[in-house]
Amino acid sequence: MDPEDEGVAGVMSVGPPAARLQEPVTFRDVAVDFTQEEWGQLDPTQRILYRDVMLETFGHLLSIGPELPKPEVISQLEQGTELWVAERGTTQGCHPAWEPRSESQASRKEEGLPEEEPSHVTGREGFPTDAPYPTTLGKDRECQSQSLALKEQNNLKQLEFGLKEAPVQDQGYKTLRLRENCVLSSSPNPFPEISRGEYLYTYDSQITDSEHNSSLVSQQTGSPGKQPGENSDCHRDSSQAIPITELTKSQVQDKPYKCTDCGKSFNHNAHLTVHKRIHTGERPYMCKECGKAFSQNSSLVQHERIHTGDKPYKCAECGKSFCHSTHLTVHRRIHTGEKPYECQDCGRAFNQNSSLGRHKRTHTGEKPYTCSVCGKSFSRTTCLFLHLRTHTEERPYECNHCGKGFRHSSSLAQHQRKHAGEKPFECRQRLIFEQTPALTKHEWTEALGCDPPLSQDERTHRSDRPFKCNQCGKCFIQSSHLIRHQITHTREEQPHGRSRRREQSSSRNSHLVQHQHPNSRKSSAGGAKAGQPESRALALFDIQKIMQEKNPVHVIGVEEPSVGASMLFDIREST
């Protein structure tokens, strides 16, 4: 015998002693089974409602009868796991822990009890009209002339629950009504009759109207000559079904479920249960692939899409798919051009809040990510991760051909060009190079016979100052700094007022003529050399002499002034 058959809430039909028959009510009689398709059509609110009704029903069975073994479905509902059953065939299926309804009807036929007929629903969207309604709680029992009473051994009252879901009327609101099955006690001191006309559930709280209940009790007990278990009372149905949302508005505002740790309140007990996992650190939902745990089942479902590659959210514009709806929402802003996050300092807008947060650090100069090894700070985590590889010597990017590792993906891409034979950098002599530094060095060697000058970073970190001013003795790292400094010494020698502006314009015109007639550089340069003031020639000679001493390869000869020398004179004139 099934374990659930052993622990049943026995219900005895009340009537003449000779006609007293025993009719056991098991958890299967009042349970609900869903197919996977039907379960998928329920929204989260309906699933929570289903969970609460099932747990409450099982609790009532425990309270009115002997101790029952906990079914598997109850354990799953208590843990909050997703629940559905296999697809139904030609006959109505059920949860593996429950017996098929057809077997239950056969057993009733053998005992001589009237067979049950499944309840039908018409006009239900999403379900066939000729199929049994999938979310009807319990068997749709017709009240017989015999009334129900307790088991003789206990000589107490028993309650039979036959919850039936009423058709949806307005805006998809559901109403659960308790069929008014009459309950009697066969003891000498009968227990007060109980009948709940409107038995509505909101997520975790049972809402009852005390005035309505008391009126129902008075209606049943008001006729002294009538037995409360007769058909006239049993066939009376509740017709005042009220939408759940109308009864729970006060609960939504009150938020009766409060967290004892942080004081945050919630509308529903299920939300409070999930919130408490933040304080306890409980993560009951674990991924079978990687072992990562989550506090909510919905988070686990989203995580599992990483392993399965399922991307149900597809962009209608470009067809790109995403595993999360939030990712699709952010992606759509690329097509619409929407940038809702605007910087209050500069007015620049972004399509993601995280991008705005990174941008704000450019104004504040904040660098919250600090290296624990050397103490260097960074404004982004990606920069910190790249920096940490210099300490750990981690090289995650490995070449498939030779096995050489690199710290950056760009370095790996450049390295792979060697194996592919790709050389994208080409000089004038049609020579090909893999990287730009090699091309630059080649061009300097071919043109000037020397290595290229130091880069900006290399010049900044130089310890020596090779360029010295002959007039004041001040030294500089770069020759351009010395040239700018020499101009400050010769400013007093420059003409002032209108004559200075005229000479500036004439120098610019001469530079323009030289640019337009490159073939006449030599003659014009020679003329410029002959017509230049003596102070200018001396200043140029001093600068060339200094550069010749420090770096003789990079100095252009004075005897044949080039366009650069003419530009130098023009700069001095303009300042």
UniProtKB/Swiss-Prot annotation:
Q: Which residues form the signal peptide?
A: none
Q: Where is this cross-link: Glycyl lysine isopeptide (Lys-Gly) (interchain with G-Cter in SUMO2)?
A: 174, 249, 441, 545
One Pfam family it belongs to: zf-C2H2
Q: In which tissues is it expressed?
A: Ubiquitously present in many human cell lines of different embryological derivation.
Q: Which InterPro entries match?
A: KRAB, KRAB_dom_sf, Znf_C2H2_sf, Znf_C2H2_type
The segment annotated Disordered runs over 92-130, 210-237, 488-533
Extent of Polar residues compositional bias: 210-224, 511-523
Q: Name one GO cellular component term.
A: nucleus
Give residue spans, biased composition: Basic and acidic residues.
98-123
Q: Which UniProt keywords apply?
A: DNA-binding, Isopeptide bond, Metal-binding, Nucleus, Repeat, Transcription, Transcription regulation, Ubl conjugation, Zinc, Zinc-finger
Q: Which GO terms describe its biological process?
A: BMP signaling pathway; negative regulation of transcription by RNA polymerase II
Q: Where is the KRAB domain?
A: 25-96
Question: Where does the UniProt annotation locate this protein?
Answer: Nucleus
The family note in this entry says:
Belongs to the krueppel C2H2-type zinc-finger protein family.
Q: Check the record and name the PANTHER family matching this protein.
A: CHROMATIN-LINKED ADAPTOR FOR MSL PROTEINS, ISOFORM B, ZINC FINGER PROTEIN
Functionally, this protein is described as follows: Transcriptional repressor. May modulate BMP and TGF-beta signal transduction, through its interaction with SMAD proteins.
> Assembly state and interactors?
Interacts with SMAD1 (via MH1 and MH2 domains). Interacts with SMAD5. Interacts weakly with SMAD2. Interacts weakly with SMAD3 and SMAD4.
Protein's name in the database: Zinc finger protein 8
* Native species: Homo sapiens
